[in-house]
């Protein structure tokens, strides 16, 4: 490290399990570092970062609280999940997002075991979580399934049907 440069807390984090031993203050610091790095990276590479910036704290909190990938977090749209990609071992690949042979701009199950659902069309995460939860009730009832959905997606008919 160059003299005068402060080591980032996120440099010591490789996977979500590394978040689980951190204090609330450390988690807040990690969220700030992730947000700043996402802005820098996406400003150069392109992409949609507003939804991920808005979901930074919840992403860090969910990966801190739940045993991912054993527990499943389902993101409604890929734009919410850039920070998720960063904390699940893909941080140093973020410059390749949405490029040929780079990271997908969406959630992609073949890209990571932490991508439990291949989100594409908005409004599907709650329905997918309900279905996944019913399947897990038979196989592994001690697992949790969490759906993350934004305000725009929450207005879709499929989301309302799942809530019903």
Regions found by a protein language model. Name each.
Residues 2-88:
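N-terminal amphipathic, basic-rich helices that act as targeting or association modules
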Residues 48-164:
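Cofactor-binding active-site loop characterized by glycine-rich and histidine/acidic residues
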